[in-house]
Amino acid sequence: MSGERVGFTGAEALELPGWRHVYSGKVRDLYEPADAEPGRSATLLVVASDRISAYDHVLEPPIPDKGAILTRLTLWWFEKLAEGYNGADAEPVEHHVVSTDVPEAVAGRAMIVKRLDMFPVEC
């Protein structure tokens, strides 16, 4: 990578300086800081790809800019949840997003999040 932004479409993990690939899902990939002990970092880099999936299958062709749009929607919802619901007594909901200061190659399609224990449920 030469610092240019990429449309992340392939099944191959990206080589991101300072980050080590740890997991690939159907449409998102996870990286941890390269200088952290494997599995022990407090944060993860979540990168949304342009891949599309349905019924547990990745389909072709990828959708251009899908990863960037998915990331913007995710950040918007987390922001709304953190603000609480207007006119209701609902408390704001804490989220796990730490930063959007990510490598330039994945800017707009990635976020740094707190590492949490996952409860594997899919609806």
Which residues are covered by each model-predicted region?
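Active-site loop/lid in soluble adenylation, ligation, and acyl-transfer enzymes
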Residues: S2-C123
